[in-house]
């Protein structure tokens, strides 16, 4: 199958593309510069331009691009986080909807922040959505896919947890202090951190492309943990104690609103739809997932 991928140079995209190619798929990457090969197509979401002709014959698309949430949220940064997702998603969805024939599937990235802070509540794809900036972003992001679904394209809205990889993301940022023996819980440590191994993210995206799941899909391990449990497991994985907690007041002073929504609160999410569809998580346990991530 011909598969179009945005964000192919990012953490997930860089891991996904070789797997799709090894499975025999033809992958075309959407890039925001002049294409360097026949396997690249140029697009500029802010300008509203995309190489629609190059997408002809695509069987599916995976949309992974979007500004990182892992920095302090200024007003300008929040606008960039929202617009980078919504504008690009709408352009891609409208373009795919106008193709003849149309692709069969659009798999779009997203996050479990869409549920907001829910304490100990167990969250599945049937749970109500929450409130807050990340929830608002998630709603708008998923809504931007509507042109594709209205055209009959099967849309999969991934709601991913913390992706475990040493190359980038939350785990990469935690590694240095933890290796120095300076790691510990964040705030109370009682907040839930739903996580997922990078290998399982890649496998789940391929599963979504080739299968028949549709709508919101929680992309998280079946075994969420609290922040205190996560930090203890990470300390064990790197062979260091975890006796230096990061107080909530310090997190708020350093990261502002981002700390409130992304560090000090969390979601206890379960991958109900993936499990019901028969997806098998290779790294369902945190210790095994951390061992795999740190061995790469």
Q: Would you name each region that the model predicts?
A:
Residues 35, 39-88:
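NAD(P)H-binding glycine-rich loop region in Rossmannoid oxidoreductase-like domains
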Residues 110, 143-166:
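Conserved beta-loop-beta element that borders a ligand/cofactor-binding pocket
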Residues 260-296:
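C-terminal amphipathic/interface module of NAD(P)-dependent oxidoreductases
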Residues 3-23:
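N-terminal Rossmann NAD(P)H-binding glycine-rich loop of SDR-like oxidoreductase domains
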Residues 138-139, 151-153, 164-173, 207-217:
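Glycine/proline-rich active-site loop of Rossmann-fold NAD(P)-dependent oxidoreductases
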């Amino acid at each position: 199958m011909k598969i179009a991928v945005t964000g192919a140079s990012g953490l997930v995209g860089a891991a996904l593309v070789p797997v799709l190619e090894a499975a025999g798929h033809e992958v075309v990457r959407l890039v925001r510069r002049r294409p360097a090969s026949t396997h690249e197509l140029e697009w500029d979401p802010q300008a509203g331009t995309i190489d629609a002709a190059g997408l002809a014959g695509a069987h599916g698309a995976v949309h992974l691009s979007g500004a990182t949430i892992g920095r302090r949220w200024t007003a300008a940064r929040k606008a960039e986080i929202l617009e980078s997702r919504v504008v690009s998603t709408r352009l891609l969805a409208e373009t795919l909807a106008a193709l003849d024939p149309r692709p069969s599937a659009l798999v779009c990235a997203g996050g479990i922040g869409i549920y907001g802070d829910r304490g100990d509540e167990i969250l599945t794809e049937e749970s109500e959505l929450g409130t807050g900036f990340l929830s608002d972003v998630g709603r708008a992001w998923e809504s931007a896919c509507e042109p594709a679904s209205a055209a009959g394209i099967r849309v999969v809205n991934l709601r991913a947890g913390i992706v475990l990889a040493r190359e980038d993301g939350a785990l990469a940022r935690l590694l240095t202090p933890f290796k120095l023996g300076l790691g510990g819980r964040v705030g109370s440590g009682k907040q839930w951190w739903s996580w997922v191994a990078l290998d399982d993210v890649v496998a789940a995206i391929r599963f979504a492309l080739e299968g028949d799941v549709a709508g919101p899909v929680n992309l998280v391990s079946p075994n969420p943990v609290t922040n205190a449990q996560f930090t203890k497991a990470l300390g064990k994985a790197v062979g260091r104690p975890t006796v230096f907690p990061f107080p909530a007041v310090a997190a708020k002073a350093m990261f502002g609103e981002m700390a409130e929504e992304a560090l000090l609160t969390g979601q206890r999410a379960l991958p109900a739809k993936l499990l019901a569809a028969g997806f098998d998580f290779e790294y369902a346990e945190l210790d095994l997932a951390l061992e795999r991530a740190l061995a790469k």
